[in-house]
Regions:
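Conserved alpha/beta enzyme-core scaffold
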Residues: 2-207
């Protein structure tokens, strides 16, 4: 069944529905006033962790299992490591081996180093990407080869989507150059110092 389209304020035909959700076409600057309330983040609890506060696990696979990874989840990542981010690739490699399907990848951005993710778009591990897509991955999406519909989000628009409940993060994988055993991370130290980790703040709060 085809999805209806409308002409937005920029004169472009756009869909009224994206990935099964209603879409609000651009009406012009200052023409749309949102309603409702911000989405509340979950309440954290120390009861979910060992008495000594040590949250360390030995592998990313174990971490994903403990988070209850399953079909259709939204997994977020940040891009502070830029073109050196190999962890995002590993997330979906693990998910593919587990047989997990139709994930939504919600990165703050992706880079040429994430080209291996194309394999997991093709085999159905990932349904779609909602974020900034660059390099070979951006080309793949632009050619219409992704199963779901891509949603390109600015950095600020991404945070807005999180806080307004438009996107609900199931698992946030937040890479950091260094961290203590309780999970207090920083962008200095280690072999991959990258500076402040601001892009990951909303993910840490709302996942």
């Amino acid at each position: 069944m085809s999805i209806p389209t409308v002409i937005n304020a920029a004169g472009r035909a756009v869909m009224t529905e994206l990935n099964g959700k209603p879409a609000i076409p651009f009406r012009g600057v200052g023409k749309y006033r949102p309603s409702g309330n911000r989405y509340g983040p979950p309440i954290p609890s120390c009861t979910d962790f060992p008495p000594d506060g040590n949250k360390v696990v030995t592998t990313l696979e174990e971490a994903l299992l403990r988070c209850g990874i399953r079909d259709g989840m939204t997994i977020s990542t940040h891009h502070h490591l830029r073109d050196g981010d190999l962890i995002s690739n590993r997330i979906f490699e693990i998910a593919s081996v587990m047989g997990v399907r139709d994930l939504v990848w919600f990165p703050s951005a992706s880079f040429p180093c994430n080209e291996p993710v194309i394999k997991y778009l093709e085999d159905g591990t990932i349904n779609r990407i909602e974020g900034s897509m660059n390099g070979p991955l951006g080309r793949f999406v632009s050619e219409g080869r992704m199963k779901g519909t891509a949603v390109l989000r600015s950095h600020g628009g991404r945070v807005q989507a999180i806080q307004d409940g438009e996107v609900k993060i199931d698992i946030a994988v937040l890479v950091a150059p260094s961290s203590d055993s309780f999970g207090n991370a920083r962008g200095t130290g280690g072999n991959s110092a990258c500076g402040v980790l601001g892009y990951a703040k909303a993910d840490a709060m709302y996942a």
